[in-house]
A protein has these predicted regions:
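Exported/extracytosolic protein signature
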Residues: 2-3, 21-166
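Sec-dependent signal peptide hydrophobic core
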Residues: 5-12
Length: 166
């Protein structure tokens, strides 16, 4: 498995662990990363294996309530790892909120205010490459019930830094 994919899986795993610990409930979660391949014009999920720039990965998180009572106010959060770009309209279910810092979430598409040269401000879309997590408000998950969320990302090309010549 190449380094880019390893970093993506590691970062995603850390974020998933933090979500479950923060909830302190009998809800367990499992995050799976799979490569998306187009076969006869339809997406097919394959083992992630080695990833390269331009590859599309799907992160699917499954939440299961193993307790005897319903779990209320469940939030499902899936990270968008560094080195990847969220793919617009790939969130399932679609009503996810997004974040650029993993802490503050808002409905998609995200926007921000930008100060222009003349001192005025303008609202502009946040680039999808700046999205760092998606969150779904699941609400109540009945005892024994399972729910799943997913998103897709593309692996970014590595950033090449070259020294300037004097």
């Amino acid at each position: 498995m190449n380094a880019i994919l390893k970093v993506c899986l590691f970062a995603a795993g850390l974020a998933m662990g933090q979500v479950v610990l923060a909830q302190a409930s009998p809800v367990s979660s499992q995050l799976v990363a799979q490569r998306v391949e187009m076969v006869a014009g339809k997406p097919v999920l394959k083992a992630a294996g080695d990833g390269k720039p331009g590859d599309v990965l799907q992160y699917s998180a499954t939440y299961r309530n193993t307790g005897a009572a319903a779990a209320a106010k469940l939030l499902a959060t899936v990270p968008v790892p560094p080195g990847t770009t969220f793919i617009a309209a790939s969130a399932e279910p679609a009503q996810a909120q997004a974040s650029t810092d993993g802490a503050t979430f808002a409905p998609m598409p995200l926007t921000r205010m930008v100060k222009l040269a003349d001192g005025s401000t303008r609202k502009e879309p946040v680039p999808l490459s700046d999205y760092r997590a998606l969150r779904w408000e699941i609400g109540t998950l009945a005892a024994g019930a399972t729910t799943a969320v997913s998103l897709r990302v593309s692996i970014d090309a590595p950033v090449v830094v070259s020294a300037a010549k004097p």
